[in-house]
Amino acid sequence: MDYYFTKGKPQLVNMKTPVYLVTQFQQLMDLMQNQYQVSCLELMQRSGKAACDFLVYRWPKVKKISIFCGRGDNGGQGYVLAQQAKKMGMIPTVWQVGHQMSMSKPPQMHEEVWYEMNSCHQQGILLHTYSPDIDLGDPELIVDALFGVGLYGHVRPEIASLLQRLQQFTVPILAIEVPTGINASTGEIAGNALAATATITFLCMKLGLLINDGKIYSGEIAFDDLLAPEAIYQQVKGIEKSSLLDSSTCFSKKIWYRNKTQKGWQLSIN
């Protein structure tokens, strides 16, 4: 049986375990910001640092990493990861997809993402604008920070081409929140998707990681609660008994967990 942890208490990942749709996850995020006064920037920084912590724990010998960042909040998490990776002695390279470095905030980019992008630039982290003909080098690990839960509709052709290119690498792929191309609520592929070696997700378990194609494409799952108060999970109820979660859905998953009561990552074993 697989487990994930909620405030130090092991719970089975099965039909009785609360998991969340994207709309419910967004409610949790709103509560964190509005009721518990945790800013969007703070949440972004907590998640990016947690992702880097897991990366180091899971692949301790990796040095050269390539982080593919979109222009949304998922990309912001990738920028935070890049900064943390440099502090920990790694050599991060950021590939900017659909945007580029700018001294003024680009249209449609959140202030927090722009802040973290500029922080990377100021710290001397390599920032490259991605193009289909550019040489991606020889990374030892790839980080997928393209869309996360923010994917709507099908993956655009130029992104699909990038995903196919990345899938040809024979190195580990760490997805932040949700593998690009996987619907975080349904687990279905949005035209094309990037299969991850592991996915780290935050605040709550997303249903799409546990069902349909998402179960396969997410690889191992790491979960970090971002220091969320226990009361928040009572305010927004997850899916406790879902017909979408049958008895065979989650039992083949490796799920790492960490919360504010724990210092390190722990792994559930079937």
From Swiss-Prot:
Which Enzyme Commission numbers does its entry carry?
5.1.99.6
List each copy of the YjeF N-terminal domain by range.
Answer: 25-234
InterPro entries on file? YjeF_N_dom (IPR004443), YjeF_N_dom_sf (IPR036652)
Whether Chloroplast counts among this entry's keywords is no
Q: Does the keyword S-adenosyl-L-methionine apply?
A: no
Which reaction equations make up its catalytic activity? (6R)-NADHX = (6S)-NADHX; (6R)-NADPHX = (6S)-NADPHX
What is this enzyme's class at the first EC digit?
isomerase
Q: Which residues bind K(+)?
A: N74, D144, T180
Q: How is the cofactor bound?
A: Binds 1 potassium ion per subunit.
Keyword entries, A-Z? Isomerase, Metal-binding, NAD, NADP, Nucleotide-binding, Potassium
UniProt binding sites for (6S)-NADPHX = D73, N74, G75, G76, Q77, G148, V149, G150, L151, Y152, G153, H154, E177
Cofactor(s) named in the record: K(+)
Q: Which GO terms describe its molecular function?
A: metal ion binding; NAD(P)HX epimerase activity; nucleotide binding
A Pfam match is: YjeF_N
Record family assignment: Belongs to the NnrE/AIBP family.
Briefly, what is this protein's role? Catalyzes the epimerization of the S- and R-forms of NAD(P)HX, a damaged form of NAD(P)H that is a result of enzymatic or heat-dependent hydration. This is a prerequisite for the S-specific NAD(P)H-hydrate dehydratase to allow the repair of both epimers of NAD(P)HX.
Q: Note the HAMAP family from the entry.
A: NADHX_epimerase
Spell out the protein name for this chain: NAD(P)H-hydrate epimerase
Q: Which gene encodes it?
A: nnrE
